[in-house]
Design a protein with these regions (language model features):
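Flexible loop/N-cap segments at domain edges
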Residues: 98
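C-terminal accessory "lid"/substrate-recognition subdomains
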Residues: 1-91, 101-125
Length: 125
């Protein structure tokens, strides 16, 4: 095809990419998380992209808490958090696991970092 390539206009730019299909990834956060800020971020994320986020679950290190908090949701529905009484085996950091369809995991990483201001955040398989 010899036709010139043009970039899509910003008005037509979407963060949905059907070529991505169903994928999963984890956010690993090596800093304590402010509970209110996290709740606001997750609410906004699921409000905007809940139809593309099939599942989110995780264990969080919350500022001021001695033990982790477990969270989970399905699309637009978030269940009540569970305050755990012990730490599971392994490293004591926050981890959120997402199952997505047609949504770039990099978008979730960028939004989390921008919204929370936390820098010790990475993705994992």
């Amino acid at each position: 095809d010899c036709a010139p390539q043009t970039a899509p206009s910003p008005a037509h730019h979407h963060h949905q990419d059907e070529t991505l299909g169903v994928t999963s990834f984890s956010l690993v956060i090596d800093q304590a998380i402010d509970w209110t800020m996290f709740g606001t971020w997750l609410t906004l994320l699921l409000h905007r992209y809940g139809d593309r986020i099939f599942r989110v679950k995780g264990i969080l290190v919350i500022e001021g808490e001695d033990f982790p908090v477990a969270v989970h949701g399905v699309q637009h529905l978030v269940h009540a958090p569970t305050h755990m009484e012990t730490w599971p085996a392994g490293p004591r950091h926050s981890r959120l696991v997402f199952i997505l369809e047609g949504l770039d995991p990099a978008l979730i990483l960028r939004s989390f970092k921008a919204f929370t201001g936390l820098t010790a955040v990475r993705t994992a398989a």
